Amino acid sequence: MNQITVMGMVLSAMPIGEYDKRIVLLTRERGKIPVFAKGVRRPGSALSGGVMPFSFGEFTIYEGRTSYTMMSASISNYFAELRGDVEGAYYGFYFMEIADYYCREANDEREMLKLLYQSLRAILKERIPNRLIRRIYELKAVCINGEAPQVFGCVVCGDSVRDGQFSAKKGGKVCVECDMDVFDGMRLEVSTWHTLQYIVSSSVEKLYTFTVSEPVLKELEQIVERYMDVYVEKQFKSLEILESIQQ
């Protein structure tokens, strides 16, 4: 067996047998990996604090032929404040579900890990609305996965000057000369186009540095929701709960 140290975040944890847990780690070095934490449910286990969802830090694990086993954890951020905020916690669970959906073992998932970490921090800072954080996260996650919408020019002809509308099914902006067969198009405020362009093109570190007006936020919500419906083939349980508690 090979002992390695990885940096990452616990996406989920589930009991295995009487005393163990199986956790899913999103790591900088190995992508998304399943890790067994043996004896972690015994009273006084030194690993108990390192296997809770949201826990971020360094994990020392053994790499076996078919599985990983956790040996120790040094947690730098538990995001403990989220546990006292029901709505904030479910935003976090939803973000982790999306990360789990997209990420794979042995892939370079550094950008997704960074996005997840910065998004949880943004929820805690409360500088911008959670509704906006959600749409930024969703759209950027899709972009990191290689399915970014075209928002700088027409998806058909490439023109970047003419007015146009956003079509989720077409994959982005369609100009007025090419929109004859667009049936799901939305005409957007100029500020909404600028917001989409900023999210698509900016680094993760600069994502949560702005806010928008309510009309722009509503358009952004509609656009991202439609885009997710087309490109994400999964129903997220945490999102269903989040939307139910917001009603």
What do the predicted segments below correspond to?
Residues M1-Q247:
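Non-catalytic alpha-helical scaffolds and adjoining flexible linkers that form interface surfaces
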